[in-house]
Regions:
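Secreted/periplasmic carbohydrate-active enzymes, especially glycoside hydrolases
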Residues: 1-218, 223-233
Length: 234
C-alpha cells in the first residue's frame, strides 16, 4: 500500500528477489529443492500499480450449500475511528450458468472500520450443480456504494456440496472417486509455469481425457488462471 508515499512525477519501482536458502530445510524439502521451478526464479505473471478509492471492495469469497450462497465481502473505507460510521449499500446480482440474471438483493450496512468483513445471504431456488461432468459456473457481482464512491467486482463459482458418509466422499450427494495426477512444477522449456489460461485449459482437457478428475500440485501453488481453467473444465 503506497497511499501517501508517492509524490507527483515519475517513479521507478525495484523488486528484490532473494532465493538464498534462508530456511535451512535441506535438499529433501520438495518445495525448496532445485528440482522444481518454485526455487529457480523470482516473479512471474502480472505486476501492476492500481489506483483505488479508499472506499472499495478488498475481496469476495463465496460459500455454497444446497439452498444458495453466503458471500463474505471485505470492504474498505476512510473510517478510522470507532466513533465514526458511514452508511453504505451492498448490491448483489447472480447470473446463472446459462446467462440468466437471477435477481438483485440490496443490503444496507454500517461501515465502522477502515477494513471490515460482512456476510450476505443469497438463496437460489433452482440450482445447477457443478461437477466433473457438468462444470456449471455462476457469476456473483457485488456493488459497494459508500461516501459517494462505487466499486464493483465479480467472481465466478460453482454450486456444490461436499460431505462424507461411511468413509465415502459425496459431491452433491453422489459418491465420487478421486482419480488424479501430480504436478511438481517441472517446466524445463520455460523455467516457469504457464501464465496463459488457454495452456491450462489444454492441460486439463488432456488430463481429463485419461479419465482423471483432479490434479495435486505438490509443494507449490499454481497461478489464478490454472484455478479458473480447472473450474471451467470440471
Amino acid at each position: 500500500n503506497l497511499t501517501g508515499k508517492i509524490t507527483p512525477g515519475e517513479h521507478t519501482f525495484t523488486l528484490k528477489i532473494d532465493n538464498r536458502n534462508l530456511l535451512k530445510l535441506d535438499t529433501m524439502a520438495s518445495g525448496y529443492s532445485v528440482d522444481t521451478q518454485g526455487y529457480w526464479n523470482g516473479v512471474i505473471g502480472r505486476i501492476e500499480l492500481q489506483y483505488e478509492e479508499k472506499e472499495h471492495i478488498d475481496s469476495i469469497q463465496v460459500y455454497t450449500d444446497d439452498k444458495g450462497i453466503t458471500l463474505k465481502v471485505v470492504e474498505t473505507s476512510d473510517v478510522h475511528s470507532p466513533f465514526k460510521t458511514e452508511n453504505a449499500t451492498i448490491t448483489v446480482n447472480v447470473t446463472s450458468p446459462k446467462g440468466d440474471l437471477l435477481g438483485e438483493k440490496i443490503f444496507e450496512i454500517k461501515v465502522f472500520n477502515s477494513k471490515q468483513v460482512d456476510y450476505f445471504r443469497y438463496d437460489i431456488s433452482k440450482i445447477d450443480y457443478w461437477d466433473e461432468f457438468n462444470p456449471n459456473l455462476y457469476t456473483a457481482t457485488v456493488k459497494y456504494e459508500c461516501n459517494g464512491h462505487t466499486d464493483i467486482k465479480s467472481v465466478k463459482f460453482g454450486m456444490r456440496t461436499i460431505k462424507t458418509e461411511n468413509k465415502k466422499i459425496l459431491l452433491n450427494n453422489r459418491q465420487i472417486s478421486l482419480r488424479g495426477t501430480i504436478d511438481c512444477a517441472i517446466y524445463p522449456l520455460t523455467g516457469y509455469p504457464p501464465m496463459d489460461i488457454e495452456v491450462w485449459r489444454k492441460n486439463f482437457k488432456t488430463i481429463k481425457s485419461y479419465g482423471l478428475n483432479h490434479v495435486r500440485f505438490h509443494a507449490w501453488c499454481p497461478p489464478d488462471c490454472a484455478f479458473n481453467a480447472a473450474d471451467g473444465k470440471g
